[in-house]
Amino acid sequence: MKKQEGEMTFLDHLEVFRWHLIKSILAIVIMAVLAFVFKNFIFDTIIIAPRNPEFWTNRMLCKLAELLNTATLCINQHPFKLVSPELAGQFTIHITISLLAGLILASPYVLYQFWTFIAPALYQKERKYARTTILISSALFFIGITFGYFLIAPFTIFFLGSYSVSHQVENYISLMSYISTLASVVLAGGIAFELPVIVYFLSVLGIITPTFMVKYRRHSIIVILIVAAVIS
């Protein structure tokens, strides 16, 4: 830790942390309020969109289906109806999604506040590695959730929404169930793309070695294929 940081007392650090925390909470609240106001964009354009025929992925797959002369790829052309079986269901979901959206939208600012708090305690070399790690991790996570949202989610929604064990059983899909499934799929994509960073840190800590990875590469390929099959 740098000398000037060593001169600060515990209460001084606590006061600095308190202000960073207050700023982060205010940012989350402001973003949550904006998300609450723009509910049509949040729900219609982002959350519910993957089940609609007009969604980008669904349109592209239909065009590909026309070129290949097969209707199999043309998915989500008859979207299922979403229901809210509880009286306060839609309002509760609106509040919950607004808070989550606020946290997501404010996350860059929250990370910045966290960084400005810990950065003075790091040496220049440590700052460089930390910045690089944060940037790479953030980029991979963003790519992962984009992949999950635009590619995995439409197929998952189509498969689960149209799956039937009997023609006598009709799907009764709640809005909360739909959102939960969509969030799980998108988050899984983000976490999956973080694997290179996780493997790197495990390698640095000596938990995973190059010899270990070479020895069990075939096993890892099988596991990846199984997980990919389950997700897709």
Give the predicted meaning of each segment.
Residues 1-232:
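Membrane topogenic/interface segments and analogous intrinsically disordered interaction regions
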